[in-house]
Swiss-Prot record:
TM regions (residue ranges): none
Subunit-structure text: Microtubule inner protein component of sperm flagellar doublet microtubules. Interacts with BRCA2. Interacts with the CCT chaperonin complex. Interacts with HSP70. Interacts with AK8. Interacts with CFAP45. Interacts with DNAI1. Interacts with IQDC.
Gene: CFAP52
PANTHER family: CILIA- AND FLAGELLA-ASSOCIATED PROTEIN 52, WD-40 REPEAT PROTEIN
Example GO biological process: spermatid development
Disulfide bond entries: none
Note: May be a good candidate as a diagnostic marker for HCC as well as a potential molecular target for development of novel therapeutic drugs.
Main location: cytoplasm
Entry-linked SMART domains: WD40
Stated name of the protein: Cilia- and flagella-associated protein 52
Length: 620
């Protein structure tokens, strides 16, 4: 039996329907395009272009690692994005053509990380700032797609520069700022040199987080970690004023934008969005948002603007009434699980750190958010009758919520010693089976008002990673990171069969006819096992590079899907054991994957907080 992956030529590509995700940790990562119709933001290694009104998405893919900064030219013709990479390796800057959504050039000089990027006002030059291991500033010619010159970004006795901004009127002047350094640079094109002038702040010592410049270049403003704003004159290189004197912005001024009509939009690390004016910087208008503000981008002249926060929220704010509207949101941490309710593909639930969210499948809208502060949810399942969402938490509790309102229905305290790591429900809605970090599998009897422990099954030596229940509720299979899969008899509550392999099992599935199971894990192999006697039927090479973390099988049992640390979604033919389709789009490790009831979609979730929806390639 041939267990090799068939040649790539025969493998079709999976069609990506939609992406739910936004990396809010990238400073000034959210941008509004000058056409005022699209917003551009990073997610993992991808740059997303999304229509604000129609929500239509395009993807710019080309980075080999996470995108760390983003810039857009004033004309809107070009997008530049920089990435992080491993120590000592070159980090790429990619120049994109916005109109055709294609890669124009790859600019490689910096090492380790690209800290910040800025375009000159007439699209002549791009300036880039290297990360802490690189420490240089480079000016690139956009026409020639080549470096003009470079220089160390900061002096010897100060910290790193982390922010860069171009002058609004002149193509030859830009400013950099960072830890104890503020510099104004002049580009000398005939001699291919850049000349810095250190700005004088007197006794003030500040670490700059954000930078903004007036439309006429008369002043530039620096937001600091101290929570105040420095106003500098680029001609005299002197400090004009500093404020506010009292009530500084909590957790620093993390985003700053100058408005054409005068005044500043300021975002703080504590999520406060403020409109204020120099020299007092007292709040004239303010609103509190969720998560530290990392981006403020104007839509047009600033009558409306978009705000991005660390908790991956994108808000639209109109200047006149200063009220926020949440237009996009997603998980800001690794997504641990995804599940569809029985028999419907209209909605699905995901869980991550702090919360469980229920999404509308076709529109990508968040319908419900259930928050439990400072806890992580490792697994979720819908009861078959749709009356509750059962969830497994790292504080050792099993919590049940109402799916329409998010109301807490009941809690099973101390369900497991080292956190609950996996959970499943029976189709008669009378039992919940949970697995813990210590390796115990526990069967709970769920009544109208009571939750009773029926049995604790102690066989596994390490955490339980996945539980699947047979359709008749008389048997279930649990996979564990101790290298065993155990098939349990749920009537007599004892072990039926044990499967051993030299791997950390991450996922397991029953074939719909329920005489075989398929497993996978860190050894990258997909194994088919006989349920009756636990013998291995066949093994396939599931991935060439990383662990397989998620797996699901269709209701007919003809195809199954896998996803893992190689960031690829693969569709397999069950009988042939061959890959038929591959989906490329994830930037983080895929943690779980599901096929929707009715085989319309495949939904995969990953460690970078992204949820990707793929079109199922076969018609059922």
């Amino acid at each position: 039996m041939d267990n090799k992956i068939s040649p790539e030529a025969q493998v079709a590509e999976l069609e990506l329907d939609a992406v739910i995700g936004f990396n809010g940790h990238v400073p000034t990562g959210l941008k509004c395009h000058p056409d005022q119709e699209h917003m551009i933001y990073p997610l993992g290694c991808t740059v997303l272009i999304q229509a604000i009104n129609t929500k239509e998405q395009n993807f710019l893919q080309g980075h080999g690692n996470n995108v760390s900064c983003l810039a857009i030219s004033r004309s809107g013709e070009y997008i530049a994005s920089g990435q992080v990479t491993f120590m000592g390796f070159k980090a790429d800057i990619i120049l994109w053509d916005y109109k055709n959504r294609e890669l124009l050039a790859r600019l490689s000089l910096h090492k380790g990380k690209i800290e910040a990027l800025a375009f000159s006002p007439n699209d002549l030059y791009l300036v880039s700032l290297g990360g802490p291991d690189d420490g240089s500033v480079v000016v690139w010619s956009i026409a020639k797609r080549d470096a003009i010159c470079g220089s160390p970004a900061a002096g010897l006795n100060v910290g790193n520069a982390t922010n860069v901004i171009f002058s609004r009127c002149r193509d030859e002047m830009f400013m950099t700022a960072g830890n104890g350094t503020i510099r104004v640079w002049e580009l000398d094109l005939p001699n291919r040199k850049i000349w810095p002038t250190e700005c004088q702040t007197g006794q003030l010592k500040r670490i700059v987080m954000s930078i903004g410049v007036d439309d006429d270049d008369s002043f530039f403003y620096l937001g600091t970690t101290t929570g105040d704003i420095l106003k500098m004159n680029p001609r005299t290189k002197l400090l004009t004023d500093v404020g506010p004197a009292k009530d500084k912005f909590s957790l620093g001024v993390s985003a700053i934008r100058c408005l054409k009509m005068g005044g500043l939009l300021v975002g703080s690390g504590a999520g406060l969005l403020v409109f204020c004016k120099s020299p007092g910087y007292k709040p004239i208008k303010k609103i509190q948002l969720q998560g530290g503000i990392t981006s403020i981008t104007l839509r047009g002249e600033g009558h409306q603007f978009l705000v991005g926060t660390e908790e991956s929220h994108i808000y639209r704010v109109s200047f006149t009434d200063f009220k926020e509207t949440l237009i996009a949101t997603c998980h800001f941490d690794a997504v641990e699980d995804i599940v569809f309710p029985f028999g419907t593909a209209e909605l699905f639930a995901t869980c991550a750190k702090k919360d469980i969210r229920v999404w509308h499948t076709s529109s990508n809208r968040e319908l419900l958010r259930i928050t439990v502060p400072n806890m992580t949810c490792h697994g979720i399942d819908f009861m078959r009758d749709g009356k509750s969402i059962i969830s497994a938490w790292n504080d050792g509790k099993i919590r049940a919520f109402a799916p329409e309102t998010g109301r807490l229905m009941y809690v099973i305290n101390n369900a497991h010693r080292i956190g609950v790591t996996a959970i499943a429900t029976t189709s008669d809605c009378k039992r919940v089976i949970s697995g813990g970090g210590e390796g115990e599998v526990r069967v709970w009897q769920i009544g109208c008002q009571t939750q009773k422990l029926e049995e604790a099954l102690k066989e596994h030596k390490s955490s339980v990673s996945c539980i699947r229940v047979k359709r008749n509720n008389e048997e279930c299979v649990t996979a564990s990171t101790d290298g065993t899969c155990i098939i349990w008899d749920l009537v007599r509550l004892r072990r039926n069969q044990m499967i051993l392999a030299n791997t950390l099992f991450q996922c397991v599935c029953y074939h719909p006819e329920e005489f075989q199971i398929i497993t996978s894990g860190t050894d990258r192999k997909i194994a088919y096992w006989e349920v009756f006697d636990g013998t291995v039927i066949r093994e396939l090479e599931g991935s060439l590079s990383g662990s397989i973390n998620g797996m699901d099988i269709t209701q007919e049992g003809v195809h199954f899907v896998t996803g893992g640390n190689d960031h690829l979604v693969k569709v397999w033919d069950y009988n042939e054991g061959e890959v038929t389709h591959v989906g490329v789009g994830h930037s983080g490790n895929i943690t779980r994957i599901r096929i929707s009831p009715g085989n319309q979609y495949i939904v995969s979730v990953s460690a970078d907080g992204a949820i990707l929806r793929w079109k199922y390639p076969y018609t059922s």
